[in-house]
C-alpha cells in the first residue's frame, strides 16, 4: 500500500489496521497513527469518523501525546449522538483524565455539561444526572470562582436526600448564600439541611451545626446558638475538625455563662 502498489480501500485499510494492532508497545500505537496518516492521503473524511477519532485518540494517549489525544477525543465527543449515553460517558471519562492532568477546569466543566445534557434526555437514574451537576458546580465554585453559576448547578445536584453528594451540595449552596451576604437564606437552607439524616461522625454534621450556631449567634438568638454549638462540640467528628469543635465548645460556654448571668440579674 505504502508503495502505491495497492489501493487503500476499506478492506485493505481494515487489514492494515488489524496488522498494526497485532504489534506491541509503541510500535503498535505508532503503527495505528501511521495507518490513519496514510488513509488521510486517500480519503481524509474517513479519518474524521467517530470510530477513527477514538482510535487515534487512544493511540496518541498511549504514546504520551496528551494534547493530540484531547483533540481526537473532543472531536469524537462532538460527533457522538446523544442517544448513545454509554459512549458519551466513556469519552467524558477519557477527557476527564486528560483535563485533570493539565488542571483544565474550564474544559472539565464543558465535558460534564455534555454528559449532563445527554443524561437529561435519557431515562437513566437521576443519581447520575445529579453527579454531573455536582461536578460542574464544584469546579465552578472552587476553581473558576463562578459563584452564581455554581449555585445553580449545586442546587440541581441536591435531590433533598442524605447522600454525601447531596449534603455537600446543599452545604456549599449555604456557604455561597453567606458569601453573597444573604444570611437569612443561608440560615433557612442550613436549618432544612440539619433536619436530614446525617451521621454524627461526619465532618458535615460538625460544619452544619457550627454554621447554624454562628448565624444564630449573630442574630443574638442565644438559645438556638447554644443548642447548635453544643451539637457541633459533642459530635464524633474526624480529627481535622477538632479545632472547630473546640471553638464551638468555647462559644457554648460563653453563651451559657451569659444566659446564666441574665437569669441571675432578673432574680
PLM-predicted stretches and their roles:
Residues 2-6, 40-48, 77-84, 114-125, ...:
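Solenoid-like repeat scaffolds
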Residues 8-12, 32, 49, 84-91, ...:
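Residues that mark the junctions of alpha-helical repeat units in TPR/alpha-solenoid scaffolds
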Residues 13-17, 55, 90, 94, ...:
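"A position-specific structural signal for the A-helix of alpha-solenoid helical repeats
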Residues 26, 63, 102, 143-144, ...:
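Structural motif corresponding to the intra-repeat A-B loop/turn of tetratricopeptide repeats
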Residues 32, 36-39, 73, 112, ...:
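Hydrophobic/aromatic packing residues within the alpha-helices of TPR/SEL1-like helical repeat arrays
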Amino acid at each position: 500500500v505504502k508503495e502505491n502498489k495497492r489501493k487503500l480501500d476499506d478492506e485493505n485499510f481494515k487489514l492494515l489496521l488489524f496488522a498494526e494492532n497485532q504489534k506491541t508497545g509503541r510500535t503498535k500505537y505508532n503503527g495505528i497513527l501511521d495507518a490513519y496518516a496514510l488513509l488521510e492521503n486517500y480519503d481524509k473524511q474517513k479519518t474524521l469518523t467517530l470510530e477513527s477519532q477514538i482510535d487515534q485518540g487512544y493511540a496518541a494517549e498511549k504514546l504520551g501525546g496528551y494534547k493530540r489525544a484531547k483533540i481526537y477525543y473532543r472531536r469524537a465527543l462532538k460527533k457522538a449522538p446523544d442517544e448513545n449515553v454509554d459512549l458519551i460517558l466513556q469519552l467524558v471519562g477519557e477527557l476527564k483524565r486528560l483535563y485533570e492532568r493539565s488542571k483544565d477546569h474550564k474544559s472539565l466543566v464543558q465535558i460534564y455539561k455534555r454528559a449532563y445534557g445527554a443524561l437529561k434526555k435519557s431515562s437513566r437514574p437521576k443519581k447520575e444526572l445529579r453527579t454531573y451537576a455536582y461536578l460542574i458546580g464544584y469546579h465552578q465554585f472552587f476553581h473558576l470562582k463562578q459563584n452564581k453559576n455554581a449555585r445553580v448547578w449545586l442546587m440541581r445536584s441536591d435531590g433533598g436526600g442524605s447522600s454525601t453528594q447531596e449534603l455537600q451540595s446543599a452545604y456549599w449552596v449555604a456557604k455561597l448564600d453567606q458569601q453573597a451576604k444573604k444570611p437569612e437564606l443561608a440560615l433557612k437552607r442550613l436549618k432544612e439541611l440539619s433536619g436530614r439524616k446525617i451521621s454524627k461522625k461526619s465532618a458535615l454534621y460538625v460544619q452544619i451545626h457550627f454554621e447554624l450556631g454562628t448565624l444564630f449567634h449573630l442574630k443574638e438568638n442565644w438559645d438556638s446558638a447554644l443548642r447548635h454549638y453544643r451539637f457541633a462540640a459533642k459530635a464524633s467528628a474526624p480529627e481535622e475538625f477538632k479545632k472547630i469543635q473546640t471553638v464551638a465548645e468555647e462559644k457554648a460556654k460563653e453563651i451559657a455563662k451569659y444566659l446564666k448571668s441574665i437569669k441571675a440579674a432578673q432574680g
